[in-house]
Amino acid sequence: TAVGDGATAFQDFRKLLDCKDVQAVIVATPDHWHALMGMMACAAGKDVYVEKPLTLFVGEGEWLQKIADRTKRVVQVGTQQRSGLHYQKARELIRSGHLGTISSVRMDAIRNVSPGFGNPADGEPPVGMDYDSWLGPAPLRKYNPNRGLYHFRWFWDYSGGQMTNLGAHHLDIVDWYLGLDQLRSVTSIGGRFALRDNGETPDTQDVIFDCGKFTVAFVMREAARGEPSGFGLRFHGTKGTLAIDRRGFKVWADP
């Protein structure tokens, strides 16, 4: 749906893709639609800017890449932190060796949303909502308010929880700064332990990425009282540590 003076609104995105004067599209839908809409846009001759996460599962990424290559379309993922000047400056410091050898990275996503998002009953979708279109490629389920915006992120049918919500941004920065091409293994443990709602994805999760020459730890808490989230990322090196989030960055160096 488009908004703004003079903009044309579409109930069916396929009609938008039929417009010959549209050169590019932005896909900012629930996650389970990202890859399919991106592929359809490429097939229609449009360049694509798609919100993260790019896909819901790995195979979708491979399909989208093949179609983008075949149609020679530009596809960019919305990991907008790369546009931040302080993220660019921090990258220069790390890649210049200012921190020495990086041996580990910690990614934090800590907040407290206890007791959760409630347990609303299944019911009828709101008037004006095309629920079949909203589901799209997802499994058929009865409508539930928590499966709509914004909380669809806590259901496996549509998303991957905070790992693919906030974790996607953090991992992109790690990849940009250090590279993840030597990734050997990923180990994850957690569950929905604390929140009393109908969500499915973990509210507590610890993930370790073995990247060959360094490790990355993702620490996610949705029900942690008293511990501030602080900086989203910490890069630990032999000469110092750099902590960074969207507000700025700070470096601690040995004397």
Task: Locate the predicted segments by residue.
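N-terminal Rossmann-like dinucleotide-binding module
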Residues: T1-G4, H32, Q81-G84, I94, ...
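Short loop/turn motifs at secondary-structure junctions
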Residues: D5, D21, H98-T101, Q182
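Contiguous beta-strand/loop segments that form the cofactor/metal-binding neighborhood of enzyme cores
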Residues: Q88-K89, T101, R106-G161, N165-P255
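Rossmann-fold dehydrogenase core element
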Residues: W63-Q81, A90, H98-V105
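Non-transmembrane alpha-helical segments in soluble domains
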Residues: R14-L17, I26, M39-C42, Q65, ...
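N-terminal glycine-/serine-/threonine-rich beta1-alpha1-beta2 phosphate-ribose binding loop
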Residues: T1-V50, L56-V74
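Short strand-turn motif at the edge of the Rossmann-like AdoMet-binding core
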Residues: K52-L54, G78-Q81, A109
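Alpha-helical packing segments of well-folded alpha/beta enzyme cores
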Residues: M37, E60, H86, H170-I173
